[in-house]
Amino acid sequence: MVKVYAPASSANMSVGFDVLGAAVTPVDGALLGDVVTVEAAETFSLNNLGRFADKLPSEPRENIVYQCWERFCQELGKQIPVAMTLEKNMPIGSGLGSSACSVVAALMAMNEHCGKPLNDTRLLALMGELEGRISGSIHYDNVAPCFLGGMQLMIEENDIISQQVPGFDEWLWVLAYPGIKVSTAEARAILPAQYRRQDCIAHGRHLAGFIHACYSRQLELAAKLMKDVIAEPYRERLLPGFRQARQAVAEIGAVASGISGSGPTLFALCDKPDTAQRVADWLGKNYLQNQEGFVHICRLDTAGARVLEN
């Protein structure tokens, strides 16, 4: 039996639309991510467990884990009879890389079960392909950090899909999921087809400056450059209370904040534990909309997806 855990991730990070993402893990030790188990069997089967299992498609072939198994078998050129279990701990349409968690855990578990026939680059390419079936286009800003850990910059040149960017140990990521769903496809459809030249220049300046600040260890500068002129101005209308929440967390002391992925989760970066706790408390009282919502104080997950049992 192989059991693989794949962590949540926060894509875009305001400054890097479709090209930046970070894996995150709660500081209290909770597992914020999906778990997939693979066992040898006579025929294929898939069982769904976990807090959000009831939100998965009722038709098994529509389940992304089934599609991962099917595509992996196709890649190897043979049917691999296994019993798979998906522990769905991540809310769907949350902006925390929920589909990436399932895809990464499923493909990594299959690869481990079969003795690692695929290298990490090929495996990551498959992960992007499968996750793209749900989001509508192939982009690696969730699957790359989820699989590899840390903060990842998408390269997609010279046979390199992504490379790690140094993060800041001081940063605490407060992630608030309000409990409502925003589909990635809907959030992408709301974006303009063309952008003004001044917005393109600002975006390039912010992203280049942010990467430079990370490598030159300028924490304050990096946080100041986390601005979004590409997606947030258009997507915030999908998120009730988002603008007020951003203003409130800034007043409490967050050094940066924005939409995690395509939303509705809000991320707020803090450089002090007491500030992070006060931000988390405010968001818990004011940004959450129902019982499915949650707030976690996280750090970068530098390990990425990992085998829990083998």
UniProtKB/Swiss-Prot annotation:
Gene Ontology molecular-function annotations: ATP binding; homoserine kinase activity
Sequence similarity: Belongs to the GHMP kinase family. Homoserine kinase subfamily.
Function field: Catalyzes the ATP-dependent phosphorylation of L-homoserine to L-homoserine phosphate.
Enzyme class: transferase
Protein name in UniProt: Homoserine kinase
One GO location term (cellular component): cytoplasm
Pfam families recorded: GHMP_kinases_C, GHMP_kinases_N
GO biological process: threonine biosynthetic process
Gene behind the chain: thrB
Organism encoding this protein: Escherichia coli O6:K15:H31 (strain 536 / UPEC)
EC assignment: 2.7.1.39
Alphabetized UniProt keyword annotations: Amino-acid biosynthesis, ATP-binding, Cytoplasm, Kinase, Nucleotide-binding, Threonine biosynthesis, Transferase
Reaction(s) catalysed (UniProt annotation): L-homoserine + ATP = O-phospho-L-homoserine + ADP + H(+)
UniProt subcellular location: Cytoplasm
Lineage: Bacteria, Pseudomonadati, Pseudomonadota, Gammaproteobacteria, Enterobacterales
Pathway assignment: Amino-acid biosynthesis; L-threonine biosynthesis; L-threonine from L-aspartate: step 4/5
Residues annotated to bind ATP: 91-101
